[in-house]
Amino acid sequence: MTKPDFRAERDLRTRGFWPVAGIDEAGRGPLAGPVAAAAVILDPSKLPRGLNDSKQLTPGERDRLYDEILLHASAVAVAFASAAEIDQINIRQATFLAMRRALLALSATPNYVLIDGNDLPPDLCVPAETIIKGDALIASIAAASIIAKVTRDRLMRRVCRLYPAYRFSQHFGYGTKAHLAAIAEHGPCPFHRLSFRPFREA
């Protein structure tokens, strides 16, 4: 299986676009918690070893790469859109919002942005393109996928301490049988997305 590489970023650099940021999200599908987005500008001389789409990595591999990315990347930022914002503006717009927030939070301003997927956020203020399966192809996007996933998972573990009945540390807000059973027994908590099923059907 092909691993993500830095060719797209190098090509953009030869065309005068530098630095280049990769952006990816985590947590579009869960019934609870925020959606997270990360933006990463990698240092081409210090590329993390073993970069891959976060979904293809074990938790231990993700944690190792998370630390390595934070240590060696030129710039890293993570941002969220809350469950309340998701309910107010819908998950698609909330994902765009988190991506814009992450981009603005970078300590360096990129001249080009590569985004996972096929849905380009509006109003980014810098040239950008989407790449389907970008987290499996593009090093900067893969790094962003790891940062977003690990950051969101750690947040949901903290939320679990506030609301232990839902066992968020086991499923991170996704609609597992155990999570649905806890919702049926206890009702929603403030971190649930009330615009999502099963809440809309209650």
Task: State where each predicted segment sits.
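RNase H-like, Mg2+-dependent phosphodiesterase core
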Residues: M1-A202
